[in-house]
Amino acid sequence: MPIKIKDDLPAAEILNSENIFIMPENVAFHQDIRPLKIAILNLMPIKITTEVQLLRLIGNTALQIEIELLHLKTHVCKNTSEEYLTNFYRTFDEIKNEKFDGLIITGAPIEQLEFSRVNYWEELKDIMEWSKCHVYSTLHICWGAQAGLYYHYGIPKYILKEKLFGVFKHEVTEEKEKLVRGFDDEFYVPHSRYTEVKREDVEKVKELTILAQSKKAGVYLILDNKGRRIFVTGHSEYDPLTLKDEYMRDISKGEDIKMPENYFPDDNPDRKPVVKWRSHADLLFSNWLNYYVYQETPYDLSEMPPSFL
C-alpha cells in the first residue's frame, strides 16, 4: 500500500522514479480507509535527503500511511529554505492537539553537544513529553535515540575516542521479540557518530530490553516493555553513498577522519560501496509499523491510552 504525502513534495519525484508507491492526496481522500498517521520530526540539516530515505522505507510496507513532516520552531535551519518548510512542514504548535499512530524522531549532527546546550532542547523535551499521550509508538534514530533515552530514562551518552564510522555486523540478542522477527542471525547497519550509550546503563532500566548489538558498534536496538518507544542507534535508513558523502565532506574540510570501515571494496573510495543493510532496514520499519503501530493502535485515536499507564 502507498504513503500519502503532499502532491508537490519534491521527494515524491525521487520516490516515484524508484517505483515507491506514492498516493496523491486527492486519491487517498476518496478511499474509505483510515491510514496510519505517522509524524516525522526531521532534525537533519538537509531535509529532503532524510525525507527520501525514510519515506522509501515506509512506502515499502503493505499499509496506507499518511505522513506529517515536522520541524522545530526554535531552530533556524541553514540548509533548507523557510519557504520549503512553510510549504511542506508543520510545527509542534500546529499539531499538538492531534494524535498520531507513530512518530519518528531523526538523528542530528550535534551529538558532541551536551543536551542542555542544544538550542532546541526545551522544544524537543516538550515533544517527547507530548508523545506520551498523543503518539502510540515512537521510533528514535541515532542522536534522536540518545536524546530519548536521556529524557525518558536518564541514560547518558559518552564521547567516543574517535568517530564510529562505517558498516558494522550486528547480532540479535532477543530472538522472540516481534521487532526482530525475520532478522538474519547476523545483519549489517551503517553508523556515523561520535558518542555512544553504554550497555550497562541500559540494563539498569528494568523497562528496557536490548534486542540487538554489535561487538564494534555497541548497543543497537532497544525496546521499552510496552513497545511504545523504540531506540535505534544506527542509520539503517542511509542511502548507498551517504557514508561516502560524509567522508568526502570531512576530507574537504581538512578534518582528520578515518575511512568508513567495511564500506568501500578494498578500502578504495573510488569503488562503489556494496549495500549490505537494505533488507534489514526494510524489515525493521515494516515490523515496527505492523506489530507496534497497526496491530496495536485503536481505530479511533481519541481512545489511545497514554504510554505511562
Swiss-Prot record:
GO terms for cellular component: cytoplasm. The active site is at C142 (acyl-thioester intermediate), H235 (proton acceptor), E237. GO terms for biological process: L-methionine biosynthetic process from homoserine via O-succinyl-L-homoserine and cystathionine. Belongs to the MetA family. GO terms for molecular function: homoserine O-acetyltransferase activity; homoserine O-succinyltransferase activity. Pathway: Amino-acid biosynthesis; L-methionine biosynthesis via de novo pathway; O-acetyl-L-homoserine from L-homoserine: step 1/1. SUPFAM superfamilies: Class I glutamine amidotransferase-like. It comes from the Bacteria. Keywords: Acyltransferase, Amino-acid biosynthesis, Cytoplasm, Methionine biosynthesis, Transferase. It catalyses: L-homoserine + acetyl-CoA = O-acetyl-L-homoserine + CoA. The record marks E111 as: Important for acyl-CoA specificity. The record marks S192 as: Important for substrate specificity. Pfam families: HTS. Transfers an acetyl group from acetyl-CoA to L-homoserine, forming acetyl-L-homoserine. Its main location: cytoplasm. Transmembrane segments: none annotated. This is Homoserine O-acetyltransferase. Its EC number is 2.3.1.31. InterPro entries: Class_I_gatase-like, HST_MetA, MetA_family. Substrate binds at K163, S192, R249. The keyword Cytoplasm applies. It is found in: Cytoplasm. It is an enzyme of class 2 (transferase).
